[in-house]
């Protein structure tokens, strides 16, 4: 049985043989390092804005070229004098350039979407890593983003993080300049930026040793954890973070690392079409108020379609100046004609509205003036009623031979008819004029209409058709 001294000796040996607790690898990121990483991430997110701006500009210019080609033709053929060959070829060049650009639109949009997707995805990886480090903070002795003048880092210290402690969202804005991915990428390892904090602060997120990191406690080996899609690889030895732990270190450019696909896609926005792009830029200058004084343009043989043109053609500087003058004059007149046309349309619309109002008023008058043929006779009000229910003021009672009493109208009341409406003759019994007539007699009478098996008054139908025809005519 071992003695107490032997036990003490064994315990001491075990302690001495255990590796010393590493400290340097728990030194957190500095504010400057986090800021440089966020600067790169923000530039990646700007790719979406740049792509959207370029696509919009490309499509707008392509549409302008189509309008320009049409206006060129109108200006040189509808004006005075015969156009020069150079002016005609300038119009053809505008149309061809538009067609060439339209053929590339699908490629442009696809490339813009690819660049936006790749770069935004990688920005998300980076910002998620920074956000985890930002949240891993308990007190002045435990933080993973260290600020030298005060331990309590704030959202304002980390450009990726908003005031609420969350991550900033991507917003699409107008951006004409290409994002500077490479310079932001290399800035991460510039100077002392990539180095860990001077004090320990106990950040185990940057410790890859399984005995020192609770997240790796079940591992049997040390692991070089990678953060931000490989942007940062944590040390596993007793060393602090330095430039060697960051991916941009010893890289010539962003094209050599994990972000090369994003950078390559960005280079294709917009697609490189030097000929069409240069021609478009040149021709669109002719829309300026003042003569742009363009230099001559050479149209090479067979450069348009097939074997056209059959020889080289020059559009001289004089041709461009003449075309600019004719285009300006045509558009000025065209604008004036457009104003006159708009004025005429407004006047026509005003008259139409007046006609509509008149037709509606006329229709209302016709509708209110229609006679009602709803007949109320004394027999309808009294026939079949018992003696006690017969109105005494307008009717009398008579006893039949069989002893039954009936309600009968007074003398002269049988043919009374209530009519409504305005106008002379509204109270006439129009329905009575047609009622009972046979079909041959009914069809000959202008005020009657044979309908089914009955002869009816047609005045109501005529009035309605007249009103509808007036309203329809007013709105045509």
Swiss-Prot record:
Residues 1-22 form the signal peptide. A lipid is attached at residue 457 (GPI-anchor amidated aspartate). It is a lipid-anchor; GPI-anchor. Keywords: Cell membrane, Disulfide bond, Glycoprotein, GPI-anchor, Lipoprotein, Membrane, Signal, Trypanosomiasis. Glycans are attached at residue 356. Residues 367-439 are annotated as: Disordered. InterPro entries: Trypano_VSG_A_N_dom, Variant_surf_glycoprt_trypan_C. Residues 369-380 have a biased composition (Polar residues). Disulfide bonds join 38-160, 144-203. It is found in: Cell membrane. Residues 458-476 form a propeptide. GO terms for biological process: symbiont-mediated evasion of host immune response. Residues 393-416, 426-439 have a biased composition (Basic and acidic residues). The keyword Aminoacyl-tRNA synthetase does not apply. VSG forms a coat on the surface of the parasite. The trypanosome evades the immune response of the host by expressing a series of antigenically distinct VSGs from an estimated 1000 VSG genes. This is Variant surface glycoprotein 4. It comes from Trypanosoma brucei rhodesiense.
